[in-house]
Amino acid sequence: MPECLVTIYWEQRKLSDIADKVTEKNTNLVVQETFTNSAEFGVISQRDFFDHDISNSESIGGYYVVRDEDFVYNPRISVNAPVGPVNRNKLGRNGVMSPLYTVFRTHNIDTTYLEWFFKSNYWHPFMFFNGDSGVRSDRFSIKDAVFFEMPIPTPSIEEQKRIGAYLDRLSNLITLHQRELEKLQKIKKAMLEKMFV
């Protein structure tokens, strides 16, 4: 049988088996930088996303502390994220996020593999079945306890690492080719402009 047709059964684990909800608040205002979670750009500084700070030092005491490699679920619905995005903090520093976000820290799973899982739409049916768009049409509503019941296909840790590394390489290759395409399009445009002057 061709390798591509072999059905592989991976263990299904609940998100709660591999992650814990972060409840650490910024009560002593130790962390001053506020993050946001964008469907397009991932976890980034709020200042970079909005060109200024939305939060202020008086309001961030009740915000959750987001450590390096933590994951963040943003319930804001968009074209790119119909149930809201889940992204990993890869900024290499800590920040804080509004309690509107769900922050979780993983264990016993490769973070790159899990990041790619959340870039897929595999988990969307679970969200649609267990949550709703709520009162506000731009926000998705799901209880934390239900969110952490989400099934995650979990191969061996070695296979997770291979899958994550493969998808990273593929993504980098696509980015490289997109840059080349943009260069060629600029050259073509310049040639057309010179040709018809």
Task: Annotate each PLM feature.
Residues 1-197:
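Feature detects amphipathic, helix-rich regulatory segments
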